[in-house]
Amino acid sequence: MLEKFNSFMEKWMAFVTPACLLTGVLFPDIAKHGVPYVTYAFAFMTFIGALKSRFRDVADVFKRPLPLILMLLILLVLGPVAACGLGHLLFPGNMNYITGMVLEFSVPAAVISLMWVSIYNGNSPLSLSLVVIDTILAPFLIPAVLKLLVGSSVKMDTVGMMKELVFMIALPAVLAMCLNEVSHGKVMETWPKKLAPFSKMCLIFVVTSNSSKVSPYMKHLNGERLEVAAAILVLAAGGYAIGWIIAILTRQNKAATVSMIYGSGMRNISAGAVIAGAYFPAETLFPVMIGTLFQQILAAFYGSMMRRVQTGQQEREKEHGVSA
């Protein structure tokens, strides 16, 4: 039963995620009750995602660091600069929107990307390393980026972010890798498949709960806000695409390509929302929160695209094999 559910979810993820988003937006009073438990769901997804990793696998990432470095450059440099440029081009008189756009693409890589990487058989140690490093750097780099690009001064709760990092990423990841070491790889071979359905359930829960936060903004949409939403959609879609293109140009293998697509495209929007709500006017929060609507849909879309490309490549390889 659980295996059938897992197969169904993986096949129809491009439709399941929009349905979850719609549910959260339409029924926010119900969906919002899940928000306090989202952190625990993230921790569980990190644990499941890390079950495919060993300590030596993470060490190997740093022996061949090019994919990791490229993703960090996309996340830390290209994303914020592109957001700032497009913001000034489209909304030259509205610094709140520009600040929100820059903030949206300055926050670290998303923990939930580990689940998507796991679904499409990406390089889990590479993705785990990216999430950990980017989240550690975030309390120092986000204020610097905002100061440099939009002139805003922000003091972040570094200790609070570090505690969240430890609970959501470090502890579950270390626990999973320790289980792999103690079991001599047996856990790695059996647990990910058994726990995969529960990871999908967590995704449904997280997407539905978090999308409840967007509901107030969706009820008061106007022409300018639709333009902001379109700009965020273009930038978000571009992040995935750039990761894919750079992976092809640098001739990365299939697993690293999957990790680069999701590592370059998915952001920890919750962190951005906390910063925007604490330090900026309410208008700044809109570009950050509207990204919630697109992130999971784009993740499912690019996953579907990857499957089609890989299926096409396999069919061509078979044809060449037969003709040879």
Q: Which residues does each predicted region cover?
A:
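Alpha-helical transmembrane segments of multi-pass small-molecule/ion transporters
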Residues: 1-324
